[in-house]
């Protein structure tokens, strides 16, 4: 079968790690007899450089026409004073494709507990997913303005927006340990009161899945104290932005974690959670694991190629266990050497 993928390498270390991800995809295609048609397009700062737009029209069309989208990283000080910033392109892409659900898996296998800033006994075997609503809340609410005397942001959520993200969380929980933690601030916010009510309604349709409610401050605390108690966390845009970044540092490095953004219909977007790291760009020292894991996530969630995704995950695990660690993990393995070992493991793996 042929799968059509749009590649958005972006800025900073994005092109380097995208090269790694596409090499892994090529190895999978060869081993399992698949065809992946890859179209590469400028995005973010690269889009500004070639078209004065972080998401050129040709890039957006390619994304709409794809079966899935891979994104490297965007941004950098070069575009700080540009009329349009690279990050504007990502917001526009999310809106254009209707990407409403961001999925961020957080895993700390026993082999990497020493990298975590938390004690081994706290983080060992941590395995949960943060499901963040992407299209509503304070980031998109109107009216929105500020001047020297006052500023206004608007927090608005509709029933439909809340219900679909909570249903997505329950859908994911059904494939895991059947527990959903809904995070809100229902003791203060009107939107959270509606959020909690709808969460209860959705839970009533899934009697085999446990629902618990936590205020966002309590959730932030428990994520550090007892991260292994979570299975699937679902929350609104602002809370999800903060909590997912907090969760990410539990592993010890942002360089290992992928994420996915899903629409109700159409292509999904897969990307590392880290930034463009312009300070280490073009030095062959960036950790490509999060990009490689994003490829695995794409194969699993967009194409249902579970065996192929498992092969990538096993290959990256064996690579790390063999001592191939990049600088962010305390080693000195280069981007290309890490990637080459993963390719070797895929080709020679079971």
Swiss-Prot record:
SUPFAM superfamilies: Isocitrate/Isopropylmalate dehydrogenase-like. Pfam families: Iso_dh. Mg(2+) binds at residues 217, 241, 245. The keyword Nucleotidyltransferase does not apply. Its cofactor is Mg(2+); Mn(2+). NAD(+) binds at residues 76-87, 275-287. The record marks 139, 185 as: Important for catalysis. Pathway: Amino-acid biosynthesis; L-leucine biosynthesis; L-leucine from 3-methyl-2-oxobutanoate: step 3/4. Substrate binds at residues 94, 104, 132, 217. Binds 1 Mg(2+) or Mn(2+) ion per subunit. Gene3D superfamilies: Isopropylmalate Dehydrogenase. It is found in: Cytoplasm. InterPro entries: IsoCit/isopropylmalate_DH_CS (IPR019818), IsoPropMal-DH-like_dom (IPR024084), Isopropylmalate_DH (IPR004429). The keyword Manganese applies. Keywords: Amino-acid biosynthesis, Branched-chain amino acid biosynthesis, Cytoplasm, Leucine biosynthesis, Magnesium, Manganese, Metal-binding, NAD, Oxidoreductase. It catalyses: (2R,3S)-3-isopropylmalate + NAD(+) = 4-methyl-2-oxopentanoate + CO2 + NADH. GO terms for molecular function: 3-isopropylmalate dehydrogenase activity; magnesium ion binding; NAD binding. One of its GO terms (biological process) is L-leucine biosynthetic process. Its EC number is 1.1.1.85. HAMAP family: LeuB_type1. Homodimer. Catalyzes the oxidation of 3-carboxy-2-hydroxy-4-methylpentanoate (3-isopropylmalate) to 3-carboxy-4-methyl-2-oxopentanoate. The product decarboxylates to 4-methyl-2 oxopentanoate. PANTHER family: 3-ISOPROPYLMALATE DEHYDROGENASE. Belongs to the isocitrate and isopropylmalate dehydrogenases family. LeuB type 1 subfamily. This is 3-isopropylmalate dehydrogenase. It comes from Listeria monocytogenes serotype 4b (strain F2365). The gene is leuB.
């Amino acid at each position: 079968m042929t799968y059509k993928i749009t590649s958005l390498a972006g800025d900073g270390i994005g092109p380097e790690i995208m090269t790694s991800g596409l090499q892994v995809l090529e190895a999978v295609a060869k081993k399992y007899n698949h065809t992946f048609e890859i179209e590469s397009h400028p995005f973010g700062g690269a889009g500004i450089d070639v078209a004065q737009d972080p998401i050129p029209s040709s890039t957006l069309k390619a994304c709409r026409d794809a079966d899935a989208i891979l994104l490297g990283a965007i941004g950098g000080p070069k575009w700080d004073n540009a009329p349009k910033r690279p990050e504007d392109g990502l917001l526009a892409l999310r809106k254009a494709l209707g990407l409403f659900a961001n999925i961020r898996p957080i895993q700390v296998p026993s082999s990497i507990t020493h990298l975590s800033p938390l004690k081994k006994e706290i983080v060992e075997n941590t395995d949960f997913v943060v499901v963040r609503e992407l299209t509503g809340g304070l980031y998109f609410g109107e009216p929105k303005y500020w001047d020297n005397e006052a500023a206004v942001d608007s927090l608005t959520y509709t029933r439909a927006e809340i219900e679909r993200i909570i249903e997505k969380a329950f859908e994911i929980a059904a494939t895991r340990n059947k527990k959903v933690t809904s995070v809100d601030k229902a003791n203060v916010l009107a939107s959270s009161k509606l959020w909690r009510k709808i969460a209860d309604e959705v839970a009533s349709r899934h009697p085999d899945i446990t629902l618990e409610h936590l205020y966002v401050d309590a959730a932030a605390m428990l994520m550090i104290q007892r991260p292994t108690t979570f299975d699937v966390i679902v929350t609104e845009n602002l809370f999800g932005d903060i909590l997912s970044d907090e969760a990410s540092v539990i592993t010890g490095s942002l360089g290992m974690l992928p994420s996915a953004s899903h629409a109700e219909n159409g292509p999904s977007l897969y990307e590392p959670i880290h930034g463009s790291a312009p300070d280490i760009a073009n030095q062959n020292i960036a950790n490509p694991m999060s990009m490689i894991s994003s490829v695995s996530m794409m194969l699993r969630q967009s194409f249902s190629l579970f065996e192929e995704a498992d092969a990538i995950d096993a290959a990256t695990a064996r690579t790390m266990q063999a001592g191939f660690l990049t600088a962010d993990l305390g080693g000195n393995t280069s981007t290309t050497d890490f990637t080459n070992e993963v390719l070797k493991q895929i080709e020679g793996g079971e």
